[in-house]
């Protein structure tokens, strides 16, 4: 249920992000293999210096604080999304995203 709800939430992300097998960078980077990945590390994506130098490694707590207010978490990020304030929606979205490994396949 949580993953299904997260899939619905991910629709807010699709104008800028892709995920899954064959995903490519768009306005934002591919989100495959997000858990444990360092911010600013997807090859071929033009990250802001702020993202590259943030030192963040994506885990649930980091993701939740970022997705609540991206520009507060990483001042200078290119991400213009206003954020998701609802904690349940943040959790659902994390559950959806983390089902995908670095190769875009579901774990």
Curated annotation (Swiss-Prot):
Residues modified as Pyrrolidone carboxylic acid are 1
Residues that, per the record, bind heme c: 13, 16-17, 79
This chain's source organism reads Rhodoplanes tepidamans (Rhodoplanes cryptolactis)
Q: Which Gene Ontology terms cover its molecular function?
A: electron transfer activity; heme binding; metal ion binding
Main function: Cytochrome c2 is found mainly in purple, non-sulfur, photosynthetic bacteria where it functions as the electron donor to the oxidized bacteriochlorophyll in the photophosphorylation pathway. However, it may also have a role in the respiratory chain and is found in some non-photosynthetic bacteria.
Its recorded name reads Cytochrome c2
Q: Which GO terms describe its biological process?
A: photosynthesis
Q: Using the UniProt record, give the first listed, main subcellular location.
A: periplasm
Query: GO CC annotations?
Result: periplasmic space
Reproduce the UniProt comment on modification after translation.
Binds 1 heme c group covalently per subunit.
Family (UniProt)? Belongs to the cytochrome c family.
Question: Which UniProt keyword terms apply here?
Answer: Electron transport, Heme, Iron, Metal-binding, Periplasm, Photosynthesis, Pyrrolidone carboxylic acid, Transport
């Amino acid at each position: 249920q949580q993953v299904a709800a997260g899939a619905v939430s991910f629709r807010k992300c699709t104008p800028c992000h892709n995920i899954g097998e064959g995903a490519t960078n768009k306005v934002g980077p591919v989100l495959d293999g997000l858990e444990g990945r360092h911010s600013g590390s997807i090859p071929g994506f033009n990250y802001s210096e702020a993202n590259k130098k943030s030192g963040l490694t994506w885990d649930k707590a980091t993701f939740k604080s970022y997705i609540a207010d991206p520009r507060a978490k990483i001042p200078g990020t290119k991400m213009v999304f206003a954020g998701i304030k609802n904690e349940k929606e943040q959790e659902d979205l994390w559950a959806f995203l983390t089902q995908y490994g670095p190769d875009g396949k579901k774990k």
